């Protein structure tokens, strides 16, 4: 059984607990190496020496930062009491999103899982806006969720994409989920044009995409809507999906990126965002 290496950024809130409960759900079907990461949000001038002591240029009180570090270390230790010694815990210093991205990339994780309070969560350390930044910048797929999904059955996974140029994408995580849960994949493209006029062409492109990416159990969908975000919401109202996967190009102005970020804050579904090749 292949092991999924998962990182859960935590601010010790209930949203971080939701993230862990989601990971537990995945753990029922596949081996998982679980890592919790807490970022002590301090300027770049505050560092740890080789002995783990706080070093600073002086604009921040060393005693204050040391106290915050001690509190965080106790909370991380308590996670092991709550969840078991099989989990790994890490404490790093820096700006929250930058530190999460750097730690994730340097340690080669398969997936980031983040609980978020959505658009109204601006007072939370791990707010919807920070989850959006991770989705935009991370080379590692991000699974975000806004509520407890410990009862989730993964039978239907939605992949939202523009299939006009079928290509082999980096869908390693999705392949692992397919292998573990054997779900039906639903390939969805949203168009502002005529569904009847485009359907045959788009379905042929979807079939080619599925073949290129080793997806065998799938269904094709083309719907008309004013944008991707509304299309995904309306599709979920018609056919209930368990997980929504949507790609982002990571560049400003492309609709997939803005749709991903809006859905993270407004769709009460686990969302996996990942970077596309094109």
Predicted features and spans:
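Short beta-strand elements of ligand-binding domains
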Residues: 113-116, 141-147, 247, 271-276
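Solvent-exposed polar/charged
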Residues: 25-28, 81, 105-106, 136, ...
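Structural beta-alpha unit
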Residues: 1-2, 41, 78-112, 213-244, ...
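Charged helix-capping and loop-helix junction motifs
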Residues: 127-130, 201-205, 255-262
């Amino acid at each position: 059984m292949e092991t999924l290496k998962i990182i859960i950024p935590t601010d010790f809130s209930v949203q971080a607990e939701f993230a862990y409960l989601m990971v537990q759900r995945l753990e029922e079907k596949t081996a998982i190496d679980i890592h919790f990461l807490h970022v002590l949000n301090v300027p770049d001038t505050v560092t740890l020496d080789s002995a783990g002591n706080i070093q600073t240029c002086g604009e921040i009180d060393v005693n204050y930062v040391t106290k915050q570090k001690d509190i965080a270390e106790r909370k991380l230790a308590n996670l092991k009491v709550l969840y078991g010694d099989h989990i790994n815990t890490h404490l790093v210093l820096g700006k929250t999103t930058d530190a999460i991205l750097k730690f994730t990339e340097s340690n080669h994780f398969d997936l980031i899982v983040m609980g978020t309070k959505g658009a109204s969560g601006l007072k939370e350390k791990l707010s919807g806006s920070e989850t959006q930044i991770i989705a935009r910048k991370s080379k590692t797929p991000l699974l975000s969720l806004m509520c407890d999904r410990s009862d989730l059955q993964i039978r239907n996974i939605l992949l939202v994409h523009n299939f006009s140029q079928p290509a082999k994408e980096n869908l390693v995580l999705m392949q692992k989920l397919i292998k573990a849960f054997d779900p039906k994949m639903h390939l969805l493209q949203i168009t502002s044009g005529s569904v009847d006029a485009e359907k045959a062409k788009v379905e042929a492109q979807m079939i080619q995409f599925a073949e290129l990416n080793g997806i065998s159990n799938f269904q094709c969908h083309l719907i008309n809507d004013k944008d991707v975000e509304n299309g995904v919401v309306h599709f979920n109202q018609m056919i209930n999906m368990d997980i929504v996967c949507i790609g982002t190009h990571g560049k400003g102005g492309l609709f997939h990126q803005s749709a991903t970020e809006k859905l993270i804050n407004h769709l009460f579904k686990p969302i996996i965002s990942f970077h596309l090749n094109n």
